[in-house]
Amino acid sequence: KNYNRIFRSAETMSFFERLRNKFRMLEFAIPFIPYISYFGEKGLKKGLSGFFKDPALQRLFTGENELLGCLIPIGWSYYGDYQSPPLGGSQVIPQWLQHVVSYYKNQVALQCCVKKILIKEGCCVGLTFDHRGHQHQVESKYIIAACDIETLYEQMLPPEAVPEKLKKKLKQADLYSSSITISLALDCPTEQLGFNEELIHLVDETQCYDAQISGDPLTTEISIIAPSLRDKSLAPEGEGTLTLYMPAFMNYQDEWKTEMDAAGNRLRGEAYHQLKQQVADVIIRRVEDKIAPGLRSHILFYEVATPVTHWRYTGNKNGTMMGARPGRKNMQNKISHYQTPVKNLILGGHWAELGGGVPIAAKAGANASLLILKKENRAAFECLAGYMDGKIPLESVLRNAAFKSYDNSWVRPLTPAEKLKDAKKPAGA
C-alpha cells in the first residue's frame, strides 16, 4: 500500500509533477525524521529504548547499525508473503523475463561481456561486446546499463565522458556488504530438523556490534532460511534445502587468498578453495551447535559462494549484494541517478537507486523504460506513468493500444527436483 508514492523516479517527471512529488515524499518521510540521528551502537540502543524498555527485546535488533534500519523493514513485511520468490524459486523471474523478450521477437544474448560504450558527439550510439572470444558490435539509440556503475564509468567509457568529481563520489560511496552463501541439500525435510517458514537470525549477543558484522565466521551474524519448506518443487520428496547467509567482505584474509593477473582477473588457487571450505565449516558448525543438532549428518552436498563468487557472476564492486546503501552520506552525494553524463545512456539496475533487492531492481527497470518512452512513445509513457502513480488500474494498462498484446503463453520450466521425480515414474505412468 502506498508504494506508488516512492516507485516513480523524479527524473521521469515534469516540473510540476516533481513539485507535487516533493510534498508526497515529505509526507512519506516525516514519520522517520525524528529517528534519523539514532545510529551507531550507543545511538541504536538509545533509540530502541524509546520503544522497548526490556533489554531482551532491544537485543532482537542487534544486527542493525541505525534505528531506521530496524523500523523500515517492518514496513516491508507484506501480508501473504508478497516478496517471497514464486513457485520454482527466484530463477523463475529471469526465465519469465527471457520468455517475454523472446515472445516479442527480440534477442537475448547470454555469456556476453560488454567492453565499450560507443559515443558520438556526447551521445551513446552503440556498444561492443565479447562472446566466447569473438568481438561484436551493436548500434543502438539508447542503452540501459544494469551493471556495476564504476565498471561502466571507468572501463566502458572514455575517461573524459564522466566528471572526475562524480567518479570520486562513487568510489567513496557506502555499499552493502557481500556475503558467504551456503546452499545445503539435505537427506530429510527441513521440518525434521526443527526449521519452519521464518527466517532465523543467529547472533552472539555478547559480541559488540562491529564483531557481529565483521565478516569473521566465528562472530558474524548468520541468517538461515529453508526454501524447500515453502516451495516443495525445490527438493525431491523426503529431502530438503537450507540456505545459510553471512555478511562478508572482499578484503577478508588477503582478499580470500586470491591474486590478480595482468588482465585484472582474480586467480583462485588451492589456498582460496581451502579458505572457502574452512569458512563454510565454521558457519555450518555454528548453526549445528545452536539451531539444528546433527545437521552435518544430513547434508548430501552443498555449494559455497564467497564475495569472490558474487563478484565473478555479477561484476558488482567487491561482490556487494545490493549496491549503495540508503543513508545520509549517499543521499548528500547524490549517488543514485538514472541519467548518466552521456546522453541516452541510462542506468537501469540497482545502482540507479539506493538499496537493493527485487523491488528496487524492478523500480529501476521500470523508471529506465519510462525515460525512453517519454521521448519515443508518449501514449505509452503516460499510461505507464499513470499506473506507477496509482492513477490507472492494471486492467486499463493491459487494454491500452499503446502496448502490444501478450498471450500469457509462458509455462514455468520444471525444477531439477521435478525432473528427477518425472524420470523415476514408470513408463506410461
Where are these regions (language model features)?
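Active-site-proximal substrate-binding core of FAD-dependent oxidoreductases
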Residues: 113, 119, 373-416
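C-terminal segments that line or cap access tunnels to active or ligand-binding sites in enzymes
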Residues: 187-305
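Mid-domain catalytic core of redox enzymes
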Residues: 85-86, 115-236, 389
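Active-site/ligand-binding neighborhood in enzyme catalytic cores
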Residues: 3-104, 111, 309-326
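A conserved FAD-binding loop/helix module that cradles the flavin
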Residues: 350-373
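Beta-rich nucleic-acid/ligand-interaction surfaces
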Residues: 108, 112-129, 301-316, 387
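Extended, polar/charged low-complexity intrinsically disordered and coiled-coil segments in eukaryotic
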Residues: 244, 428-429
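A glycine-rich dinucleotide-binding beta-alpha-beta segment and adjacent secondary-structure elements
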Residues: 53-68, 223-225, 284-354
